[in-house]
C-alpha cells in the first residue's frame, strides 16, 4: 500500500541521504520524492510516497525518521492529505489525426496545457493526482512519447 510521509528537516548536507537510507535498509520502494524550502529559512519539507506492507511498518518508518539528526518532524499524512499533485512534461510525436488527439486530451481539460505545437512534436504539461497522470500516460500510449519528465508528489494538509 502506498503511504504519504511528510518530513520537515533542517536544510543540511547529507540529510536526504540519511532519510532515504532508512527506506533502503528496510527494502521499501520510494515511489515519489519531492523537497521544497519552507517560508522559514533553513527548513525544508520533504514528501515521500512509499510502498509499505502494512500500517505498523509505516509507524516504524516514522519513528526511525524522527530519530534522525536534522529531522524536526515526520508524519504519515496519507489520510489527512487534502491536496496531492504531480507535474509531468511530455514530448510527444505529432499525431497524424489531430481530432482523435483532441478527444483523448479533452477529459484532462484544465489540467493539461499544450506548451508548444510543432510540425513533428507536441510538448504537453499536465498537473494532477498520481492516478490522473497515470491515466493520461496510458491514454497517450497510441502516440510515440519521446520524452517524459515527472516531478514527485507535492501534498498539503
Show where each model-derived region lies.
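Long, contiguous binding/interaction regions
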Residues: 1-4, 10-45, 52-157
Amino acid at each position: 500500500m502506498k503511504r504519504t510521509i511528510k518530513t520537515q528537516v533542517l536544510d543540511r548536507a547529507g540529510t536526504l541521504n540519511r532519510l532515504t537510507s532508512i527506506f533502503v535498509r528496510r527494502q521499501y520502494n520510494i515511489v515519489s520524492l519531492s523537497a521544497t524550502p519552507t517560508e522559514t529559512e533553513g527548513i525544508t519539507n520533504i514528501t515521500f510516497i512509499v510502498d509499505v506492507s502494512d500500517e505498523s511498518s509505516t509507524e516504524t518508518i516514522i519513528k526511525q525518521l524522527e530519530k534522525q539528526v536534522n529531522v524536526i518532524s515526520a508524519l504519515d499524512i496519507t489520510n489527512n492529505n487534502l491536496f496531492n499533485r504531480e507535474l509531468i512534461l511530455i514530448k510527444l510525436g505529432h499525431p497524424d489525426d489531430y481530432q482523435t488527439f483532441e478527444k483523448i486530451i479533452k477529459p484532462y481539460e484544465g489540467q493539461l496545457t499544450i506548451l508548444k505545437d510543432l510540425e513533428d512534436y507536441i510538448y504537453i504539461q499536465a498537473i494532477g493526482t498520481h492516478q490522473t497522470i497515470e491515466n493520461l500516460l496510458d491514454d497517450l500510449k497510441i502516440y510515440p512519447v519521446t520524452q517524459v519528465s515527472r516531478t514527485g508528489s507535492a501534498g498539503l494538509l
